[in-house]
């Protein structure tokens, strides 16, 4: 794979002031000698000249030269800074490919090469991709912590603890005659395993919060027809996306939108009003409402406070323990006496008076902004959970009467699952799967 040369537009297919075309591999400098009228630079040098095709000038550019491994990719690399028109940039890329000395890079292939060349580990590689795709401040900070290695230290600490236990077992197996070696029975080993499991549980608990950071907090707006769900969604996303009408059952399908609060991304779902109905299409919409409730992290149950005979929807009973449920009374502007609702979340979507709701949501999810050190993406969480399962298998073996020489097999599996987070893997398909999600040219 690393014996060929790759190229791609690193700055995206849009009109812009400056575009970047990246070439990496053993033929990078040779290609430039064919298409560049200007000085071939030394490593870490910038030179000025023309890109040409058989002396037909195409664009005046700046070229950054990186020889050897003194760059992100870890091999000979050239970056052409051209005028950023889409046509102009693609003409240069086509000219590079025309030399037959390079092929078009796959998505994420420059980062993959950086990983294979030992310039970055898998955590840092994924952090780069997360930085690129961050939509809100908390996502950006989480990705930056990953890139700086802050999260890695927590996982490395677990790896070291597993290695320590494996080492003790191996010494007992290989050198049983040594007087200064602690005799390792199941009774001695089990407390160490239990402590290890407690450490895994603590890390998984913290890591699971990362999903809310990376994927956004799925927020479902539910309630009876005409309670003000659509009005609230339009206020939150600052857009008239949901249809507002006095006719019950106007919203038939799930309407989606995003909003940012306190640096966190909330993904909103406005659902069909829930009520008893014989209308087939409306029934389908109500079924989708219940499906959205199941998927939500935050359930906002909107109730018309002005309605005397309110429909009793016991939606709280449908919420899981891991879901946040909030009952919100809307249409405060129609109330003569608000005393009944003094302990409730009372809003007026019509007049955009929702400050108390926003403050409540901020207070509930404030903990996500406080975890500045450890975050994990879905791949990393999966590996940590697989590691824990292997430790549980080791514990089961010991409790079933098997000796440490059996438990060590599962401990080594746990060790491997955690090491995979950093890219110590032999599975090429796994690497392809991870890096294929990256941008072209990265």
Swiss-Prot record:
Keywords: Cytoplasm, GTP-binding, Hydrolase, Magnesium, Metal-binding, Nucleotide-binding, Potassium, tRNA processing. Mg(2+) binds at residues 230, 251. Gene3D superfamilies: P-loop containing nucleotide triphosphate hydrolases, Probable tRNA modification gtpase trme, domain 1, tRNA modification GTPase MnmE domain 2. CDD domains: trmE, TrmE_N. It is found in: Cytoplasm. (6S)-5-formyl-5,6,7,8-tetrahydrofolate binds at residues 22, 79, 119, 442. PROSITE patterns: G_TRME. Signal peptide: none annotated. GTP binds at residues 226-231, 245-251, 270-273. Its EC number is 3.6.-.-. K(+) binds at residues 226, 245, 247, 250. Binds 1 potassium ion per subunit. One of its GO terms (cellular component) is cytosol. Residues 216-366 form the TrmE-type G domain. It comes from the Bacteria. GO terms for biological process: tRNA methylation; tRNA wobble uridine modification. One of its GO terms (molecular function) is GTPase activity. PANTHER family: TRNA MODIFICATION GTPASE GTPBP3 (PTHR42714), TRNA MODIFICATION GTPASE GTPBP3, MITOCHONDRIAL (PTHR42714:SF2). Homodimer. Heterotetramer of two MnmE and two MnmG subunits. HAMAP family: GTPase_MnmE. Exhibits a very high intrinsic GTPase hydrolysis rate. Involved in the addition of a carboxymethylaminomethyl (cmnm) group at the wobble position (U34) of certain tRNAs, forming tRNA-cmnm(5)s(2)U34. Belongs to the TRAFAC class TrmE-Era-EngA-EngB-Septin-like GTPase superfamily. TrmE GTPase family. This is tRNA modification GTPase MnmE. It comes from Mesomycoplasma hyopneumoniae (strain 7448) (Mycoplasma hyopneumoniae). The gene is mnmE.
């Amino acid at each position: 794979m690393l014996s060929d040369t790759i190229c791609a537009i690193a700055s995206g297919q849009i009109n812009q002031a400056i575009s970047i075309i990246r070439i990496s591999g053993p033929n990078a400098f040779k290609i430039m000698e064919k298409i560049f009228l200007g000085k071939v630079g030394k490593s870490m040098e910038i030179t000025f000249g023309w890109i040409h095709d058989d002396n037909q000038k195409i664009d005046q550019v700046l070229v950054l030269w990186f020889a050897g491994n003194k760059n992100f990719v870890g091999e000979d690399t050239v970056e052409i800074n051209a005028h950023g028109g889409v046509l102009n940039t693609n003409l240069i890329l086509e000219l590079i490919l025309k030399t037959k000395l390079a092929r078009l890079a796959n998505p994420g292939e420059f980062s993959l090469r950086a990983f294979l060349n030992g310039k970055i580990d898998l955590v840092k590689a994924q952090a780069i991709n997360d930085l690129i795709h961050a939509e809100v401040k908390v996502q950006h900070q989480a990705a930056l912590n990953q890139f700086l290695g802050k999260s890695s230290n927590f996982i490395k600490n677990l790896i070291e603890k597993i290695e320590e236990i494996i080492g003790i077992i191996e010494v007992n197996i290989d050198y049983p005659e040594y007087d200064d070696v602690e005799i390792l029975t199941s009774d001695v080993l089990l407390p160490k395993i239990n402590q290890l499991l407690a450490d895994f549980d603590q890390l998984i608990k913290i890591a699971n919060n990362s999903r809310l950071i990376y994927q956004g907090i799925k927020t479902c707006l539910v309630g009876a027809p005409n309670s003000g769900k659509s009005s609230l969604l339009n206020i939150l996303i600052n857009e008239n996306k949901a249809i507002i009408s006095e006719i019950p059952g106007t919203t038939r399908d799930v309407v989606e939108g995003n909003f940012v609060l306190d640096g966190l991304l909330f993904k909103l779902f406005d659902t069909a009003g829930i009520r008893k109905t014989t209308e087939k299409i409306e029934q389908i919409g109500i079924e989708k409402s219940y499906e959205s409730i199941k998927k939500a992290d935050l359930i906002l149950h909107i109730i018309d406070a002005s309605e005397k005979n309110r429909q009793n929807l016991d939606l709280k009973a449908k919420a899981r323990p891991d879901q946040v449920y909030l009952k919100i009374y809307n249409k405060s502007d129609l109330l003569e006496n608000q005393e009944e609702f003094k302990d409730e979340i009372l809003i007026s979507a019509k007049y955009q008076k929702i400050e108390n709701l926003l403050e409540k949501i901020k207070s509930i999810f404030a903990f996500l902004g406080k975890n500045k050190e450890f975050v994990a993406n879905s791949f990393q969480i999966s590996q940590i959970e697989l590691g824990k399962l292997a430790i549980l298998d080791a514990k089961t073996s010991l409790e079933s009467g098997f000796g440490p020489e059996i438990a060590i097999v599962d401990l080594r599996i746990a060790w491997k699952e955690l090491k995979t987070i950093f890219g110590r893997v032999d599975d090429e398909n796994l690497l392809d799967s991870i890096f294929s999600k990256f941008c072209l040219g990265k």
